């Protein structure tokens, strides 16, 4: 099997049991060498956005909290570096649905630790669904029980990666509930997204769910 990122041939690691039951070892879409190049976020982090920081909350998050936005306590697994950008380029923008397997187990394990009563993926617009064919976040969460209770108000939107930081911060509420008047009283919700950039998207989603009675909300992103 060829690694989707570097093009090298992958050699699966066989166990004695594999030989006896004629079972071919499972291989992910990318090789071990490429997986090792993703940078895990470790050490002191901002408890609000998940970035590596000696100060918590970091200066950026202090602005959000001072402005009255509720805390989201984001947990980010990896740095959004060159390796991660290459992965997203192929996964999100070049139809790489098969690459969803790379981070499925890691995200599932993190969500087990978070232990929310509901897991809510950030939705995509109808236009994006038609173009891409899948929601990149929901695809990662195939091994989890998810609650797709948020939807996009508009059927189309400007691509987030093309917006300036100022434009991201000024976006209006893009989400609403799939079911009007849904009662989320008592629910401890974890919102999952792909990348934490400014935090605007996660805070929009969080506000929408709090307005419907959610008791506690935290967030998890693959990258920061």
Regions found by a protein language model. Give the residues of each.
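Glycine-rich phosphate/pyrophosphate-handling loop used in enzymes and phosphotransfer proteins
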Residues: 1-224
